Swiss-Prot record:
Main location: cytoplasm
Cellular component terms per the entry's GO annotation: cytoplasm; endopeptidase Clp complex
Protein name according to UniProt: ATP-dependent Clp protease proteolytic subunit
Catalytic activity reported: Hydrolysis of proteins to small peptides in the presence of ATP and magnesium. alpha-casein is the usual test substrate. In the absence of ATP, only oligopeptides shorter than five residues are hydrolyzed (such as succinyl-Leu-Tyr-|-NHMec, and Leu-Tyr-Leu-|-Tyr-Trp, in which cleavage of the -Tyr-|-Leu- and -Tyr-|-Trp bonds also occurs)
Length: 201
């Protein structure tokens, strides 16, 4: 089990201990920093809904360092980001690959950021199915439907032509922060908090 730091906060009622992620959640910061799968997606969705209930008019900040993962789990997070009232700013720290890159570009337009040395990767969904030929055919058709859906979502958020997206996602397509900005996955590259403060003006 990985160690999670604990923060001690002094209050008028005494000391209170938070794990570091819970403390940052108080500041409306959510971390997507692992493989995207059902359990973690449920936790991220719950945090988004909680912060909306706390204040539907205040922005949420999502920090992403993820290699990607399960498409349906990623879409659960993505759909919730679009569903809730607060704007969701996204920031890539380290990497945003596969479904991680969709979450990155699915943030509020103008509020999608990357640190200078982050890596972003897009690609088509993959499937490895076993069983009867008919079942494999069913899963293959579903994978093609998911592929079309993802291409349409990337096209929507990057403002790129669908045909260009389809070509770009045929194989693993790694990008630097600058390349991701040119592609339309992020809006700005930031190296300090001063940069964010300037862009927010």
């Amino acid at each position: 089990m990985s160690y999670v730091p604990v923060v001690i906060e002094q209050t008028s009622r005494g000391e209170r201990a938070y794990d570091i992620y819970s403390r940052l959640l108080k500041e409306r910061i959510i971390f997507v920093c692992s493989t995207v799968e059902d359990h973690m997606a449920n936790l991220i969705v719950a945090q988004l809904l909680f912060l909306e209930a706390e204040n539907p008019k205040k922005d949420i900040y999502m920090y992403i360092n993820s290699p990607g993962g399960v498409v349906t789990a990623g879409l659960a997070i993505y759909d919730t980001m679009q569903f809730i009232k607060p704007k969701v700013a996204t920031l890539c720290i380290g990497q945003a690959c596969s479904m991680g890159s969709l979450l990155l570009c699915g943030g509020e337009h103008g509020m999608r950021y990357s640190l200078p040395h982050s890596r972003i990767m897009i690609h088509q969904p993959s499937g490895g199915y076993k069983g009867q030929a008919t079942d494999i055919e069913i899963h293959a058709r579903e994978t093609l439907k998911i592929k079309r859906l993802l291409n349409e979502l990337y096209s929507k958020h990057t403002k790129q032509e669908l045909k260009y997206i389809e070509k770009s996602m045929e194989r693993d397509n790694f990008m630097s922060s600058e390349e991701a900005k040119k592609f339309g996955l992020v809006d700005n590259i930031i190296s300090s908090r001063d940069t964010i403060a300037f862009l927010a003006q």
